[in-house]
């Protein structure tokens, strides 16, 4: 790296914009090592009418979590009969992300938006790897819990208070999501638009360090 190079400006005109995708998954276990990815839901944050939803056949070699089933309410028998092959399904999702981004914002880069993003990202990045497809989001992801904590964090806000039921008390949405991957993704999109606007109104311009 060149020494004493002037720092780049905080923002540059003409840089590619991001195309925000709200994404949610449902699974049959806590990690990809012990369970299966069973459904993927997604929509554009700024046009939630553009949606994707798919249910996947569970991996027969993985355990099935009854605790998780009580949350997502998808039975193993239903998914075995009606689910799509998981490799095919993940490839369809990657194709949809790329095609949708190119259709609505051809100069943009897809940005993954989630609520407790590490969980959903963990499952999808493993699924993309297993399917042999490039992650359409690259390494770009946003966590709405983190944005909320940044906006409202302090001595009286612990990370445990960023669970969705508390966040929705501050920023209620018009939607009722109940662990259906698509419904959750659409609800997240509304929350993302709200938090983004709040962040814009409270934006502190970055101060770039002076060169030494």
Task: Give residue ranges: language-model regions.
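Acidic, Mg2+-coordinating catalytic module of metal-dependent nucleases/exonucleases
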Residues: 111-118, 122-123, 127-128, 160-212
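Short, glycine/charged-enriched secondary-structure capping and boundary segments
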Residues: 36-38, 126-130
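Active-site-proximal helix-loop-helix substrate-binding element of RNase H-like nuclease domains
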Residues: 57-65, 69-72, 76-79, 142-186
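A short alpha->loop->secondary-structure connector
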Residues: 128-138
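The first long alpha-helix at the start of the GST-like C-terminal all-alpha domain
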Residues: 115-117, 140, 144
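Acidic active-site catalytic centers that drive phospho-/nucleotidyl reactions
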Residues: 24-26, 120, 143, 184
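Conserved protein kinase catalytic core
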Residues: 30-32, 149, 190
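Conserved non-catalytic scaffold segment of RNase H-like nuclease domains
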Residues: 2-118, 179
